[in-house]
Swiss-Prot record:
Record: residues binding substrate: 250
Top-level lineage group: Bacteria
Gene that produces this protein: sseA
One GO CC term, this protein: cytosol
Modified residues (N-acetylproline): 2
Listed name of the protein: Putative thiosulfate sulfurtransferase SseA
Domain Rhodanese: 31-138, 168-286
Further comment: Was identified as a high-confidence drug target.
EC number from the UniProt entry: 2.8.1.1
Protein species of origin: Mycobacterium tuberculosis (strain ATCC 25618 / H37Rv)
NAD among keywords: no
Cross-referenced CDD domains: TST_Repeat_1, TST_Repeat_2
Catalysed reactions listed for this entry: thiosulfate + hydrogen cyanide = thiocyanate + sulfite + 2 H(+)
Length: 297
């Protein structure tokens, strides 16, 4: 049975406030039946140096991705993962992580691929929890098998592929959420990260550049509904929007903002992103600060 939504007035203006919880709400419901807490970080070692009591760790790389094919795990593997982590199909899952929930949003997006009904983010994530000196532990909870059912992934509503992107160029909004250096073609990866994963640099023609981190404030919380509406004011209600980054993790954060905080009806994450596009043969690429135009073939 899903837990009640967080009634905090700080969340009420969002289109789907039930997709967020505050630290106060999580503290008050900690240990409640039907609540599963998940930590998913970019830095996969953080869980081991202290985490929210009762939280289990999901490693974005080893737990959610197929070990050989570039794809996500299948229904059988997801059910096994949920069993191992003690998560039931009808649990309320609250996910949090480092860096303004960057990777936590990615985990939430994967949960959504499998149709888990009630999955939420902790607003502010791990960093805000620690900044407020809330309780942490080194204890790893012992979980029992939940009998999570095998549910096949449903990619179509929220996942885009390369051909989908080619089909909408110039006709529907395309948002590049990477760093300015990546967008302009100066780098193939973020500053302070190794240059790897793509043979070409730049961005997809017509893509508007809005770095994912602009949706969060200095505390790691999401910006207000009003601020977010201004940031994405070019998106119309009937648009079919696609977001992308390098491997789909930063764009998952933007997907969450557009879908759950602003209520946009048709938003898909192109998780192939630049490590596919920047290696593909004969796809159009633009360098510089302007979105560019669709080339005439």
């Amino acid at each position: 049975m899903p837990l009640p939504a967080d009634p905090s007035p700080t969340l009420s203006a969002y289109a789907h406030p039930e997709r967020l919880v505050t630290a106060d709400w999580l503290s008050a419901h900690m240990g409640a039946p039907g609540l599963a807490i998940v930590e998913s970080d970019e830095d996969v070692l953080l869980y081991d140096v202290g985490h929210i009591p009762g939280a289990v760790k999901i490693d974005w790389h080893t737990d959610l991705n197929d070990p050989r094919v570039r794809d996500y795990i299948n229904g059988e593997q997801f059910a096994e993962l949920m069993d191992r982590k003690g998560i039931a199909r009808d649990d309320t899952v609250v996910i949090y992580g480092d860096k303004s929930n960057w990777w936590a949003a990615y985990a939430l997006w994967v949960f959504t691929l499998f149709g888990h009904a009630d999955v939420r983010l902790l607003n502010g994530g791990r960093d805000l929890w620690l900044a407020e000196r809330r309780e942490t532990t080194l204890d790893v909870p012992t979980k029992t098998c939940t009998g999570y059912p095998v549910v096949q992934r449903n990619d179509a509503p929220i996942r885009a592929f390369r051909d989908d992107v080619l089909a909408i160029l110039g006709a529907q909004p395309l948002i590049d959420v990477r760093s300015p250096e990546e967008y302009t073609g100066k780098r193939t990866h973020m500053p302070d990260y190794p240059e790897e994963g793509a043979l070409r640099a730049g961005h997809i023609p017509t893509a508007v550049h809005i770095p994912w981190g602009k949706a969060a404030d200095e505390s790691g919380r999401f910006r207000s509904r009003e601020e977010l509406e201004r940031l994405y004011d070019f998106i119309n209600p009937d648009d079919q929007t696609v977001v992308y980054c390098r491997i789909g993790e930063r764009s998952s954060h933007t997907w969450f903002v557009l879908t759950h905080l602003l209520g946009k009806a048709d938003v898909r994450n192109y998780d192939g992103s630049w490590t596919e596009w920047g290696n593909a043969v004969r796809v159009p690429i633009v360098a510089g600060e302007e979105p560019g135009v669709v080339p005439v073939v």
